[in-house]
């Protein structure tokens, strides 16, 4: 009888085999179902994520485009604002320069007014008077100083506002430059796609950078810069109008004062010429009267000498008749007549001597008054010359410098002319 040469392996039951086959089949179906479910979910997920990514990329591309449009609109607004601001800065600078030129132009009227006051300091004696001309000249100096003060204030305001506009311009430039950089970055982002060579994963790209701002803060910042620039440009326009008005008003005030001063000068010159003519007429009449009086004195002296000769004759006759002898020494009619003649001659001579003394006193008085008249004529001549020089000097205010030719000799002028203490005191009092 034959025997097995190997040990038999463990045997499974048929039911176990069938169960195992069933389980394998069932598990295979379940795994296939699960795999199918996973495949379907993966497909759905892939489709959904693909769609989501497409829409997200489309939305963000749209947002980028809209953001670029928004930033570009603000950039264009800032462009216009900067252009307007540059134009306003130039206009205000021109207005400031015009005010500075007008301020510089006030030096000539001031110099002329001070020169006229200085010239009139050379008046002499009674002509050193506080007349309307001096009052107008002092008023002119006061008006010029006031106009210079007004213009200087406007120049200072323009300078300060120019500094403010420059500061605003720098702020706008900075904002404009930032927006240009932003547009460049966002346009670069908008141009990127899946095939772009320079795309890559970044380290923590979702981080919030330091000093980030909200959209509201961003909008308010740019709007504030724009509104501030517009407000300051409006203020600059008002300042330019105020500068133009100040220039016009100061020029009108100065021109009106110049006309008033020159009218007073002409009136004073006519008055002075009238007094001068009157004095010359008085001098002529006084000289004629002196000549006539001197002639009368000579005739009085000649008559007095003749009367003395007549007196000598009468004295000699009376003295000679005292030498008659004896009874011939008679007091006859001849003696009485000679005595009467002597008395009459002595009275006449005394009267004539008194009249001669009165005439000589009158002549002395005429000579003294003539000296006063001639001294006053010299003063008036000097004053007329000085006022004529002043009028000639004032022609510089209406005649261009290149065409100005002095009509009379004038004093050498200095740049920094100062008033006398008397004039300074008068200016302070006014």
Curated annotation (Swiss-Prot):
Entries under InterPro entries matching the protein: Tektin-like, Tektins
Keywords: Cell projection, Cilium, Cilium biogenesis/degradation, Coiled coil, Cytoplasm, Cytoskeleton, Flagellum, Microtubule, Phosphoprotein, Ubl conjugation
Post-translational modification: Ubiquitinated, leading to its degradation. Deubiquitinated by USP16, promoting its stability.
Tissues/organs with expression: Expressed in the testes (at protein level).
GO cellular component labels: axonemal A tubule inner sheath; axonemal microtubule; microtubule organizing center; sperm flagellum
Main location: cytoplasm
Subcellular localization: Cytoplasm, Cytoskeleton, Cilium axoneme; Cytoplasm, Cytoskeleton, Flagellum axoneme; Cytoplasm, Cytoskeleton, Microtubule organizing center
Pfam families: Tektin
One GO biological process term: inner dynein arm assembly
Coiled-coil segments on the chain, per record: 75-162, 226-380
Family of the protein in this entry: Belongs to the tektin family.
Function noted in UniProt: Microtubule inner protein (MIP) part of the dynein-decorated doublet microtubules (DMTs) in cilia and flagellar axoneme. Plays a key role in the assembly or attachment of the inner dynein arm to microtubules in sperm flagella and tracheal cilia. Forms filamentous polymers in the walls of ciliary and flagellar microtubules.
Record text on subunit structure and interactions: Microtubule inner protein component of sperm flagellar doublet microtubules. May interact with CCDC172.
PANTHER family per the UniProt record, alphabetical: TEKTIN, TEKTIN-2
Name of protein: Tektin-2
Protein source organism: Mus musculus
Gene that this polypeptide is encoded by: Tekt2
